[in-house]
């Protein structure tokens, strides 16, 4: 993967606290398929993670370790 594309995707996810595949593709001026390819490589490298896969739902990507939108904190005391 090109360092440029890797850095652009990571920067986008950092600035926007995540995003959908289509949003990332549009921001980087690439096709949805190209964006998905790079995102899957970053996921495999452990740098990003995605929302759980559900049929018919958009995939939401975010930096590894970031709290997913709508996820609550649970504490054990």
Curated annotation (Swiss-Prot):
Keywords: Activator, Fimbrium biogenesis, Transcription, Transcription regulation. It comes from the Bacteria. Signal peptide: none annotated. GO terms for biological process: regulation of DNA-templated transcription. SUPFAM superfamilies: Winged helix' DNA-binding domain. The keyword Transcription applies. This is P fimbrial regulatory protein KS71A. The gene is KS71A.
């Amino acid at each position: 993967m090109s360092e440029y594309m890797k850095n652009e995707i990571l920067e986008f996810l950092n600035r926007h606290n995540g995003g959908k595949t289509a949003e990332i593709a549009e921001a980087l001026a690439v096709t949805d398929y190209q964006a998905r390819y790079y995102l899957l490589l970053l996921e495999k490298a452990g740098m990003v993670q995605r929302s759980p896969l559900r049929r018919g739902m958009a995939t939401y990507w975010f930096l590894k370790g970031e709290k997913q939108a709508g996820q609550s904190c649970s504490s054990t005391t």
